[in-house]
C-alpha cells in the first residue's frame, strides 16, 4: 500500500511554532503587496491593506479616499496626504476629527502647520491635544460626528464587496476602494435629496 500523506509532513522544514509572525517571515502567495497587521491587542495579525477616508461633517460624504499598505503609521500619513490633496495651500482654517490612534505629537504638529485644527480624541495619558482645542464647542461637535466614518466602511464591506476583494496589488485594490466610496456617496444621495 502507498504511504498516506498527512498535513503534518507538508512543510516539515519550516516550523514557526512559538515564533512571532512578522512581514519578514510571512508573505501572501496570492498578493505580495498585502502586509500583516494587528488591528488591536488580543486579535490576530491578518494579511491586508488599509483603507482611509476623509468625510465632511455636514452630511457624511466621503470627499477623499486612499488605500495603502498596512503599517502602524499609514493612517496618519494618509490623513495628511488627503488633507493636502483636498485643500492644497489653503489658508482657511479647517478642522479634522479623528480617533485616539491619531493622537500623536508629530501628527498634531503637522496638522497645525497645515492650518488644520486637530479635533482628535484624547488619550488618557500623554495626549498631544491640549485645553486650547478641547474647550471649544466645535471640538465636542467633531467628536460626535467622527463616528460617521464607520458607516461608509461598513457599507463597503457588506454591500460594496470590500470585505474580501478579488483584486490583487495596491493600485488595483485602491481603485476598487475609491470606486466603492464613490458608490456609497451615490447610494446615500436619494435619501438626502428626499429630506
Please describe what each predicted stretch is.
Residues 127-134:
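Short, charged, surface-exposed secondary-structure boundary motifs
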Residues 57-59, 122, 157:
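Short, small-residue-rich loop/turn micro-motifs
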Residues 65-68, 108-113, 123, 167-171, ...:
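Composition- and surface-driven signal marking solvent-exposed, interaction-prone regions
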Residues 96-99, 111, 118, 150-152, ...:
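Hydrophobic, well-ordered secondary-structure elements that form the walls
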Residues 1-112, 184:
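Polybasic low-complexity intrinsically disordered regions
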Residues 139-195:
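Basic, amphipathic alpha-helical segments enriched in Lys/Arg and hydrophobic/aromatic residues
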Residues 107, 112-117, 180, 188:
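C-terminal, active-site-flanking charged/polar segments
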Residues 116-126:
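RNase H-like polynucleotidyl transferase catalytic core
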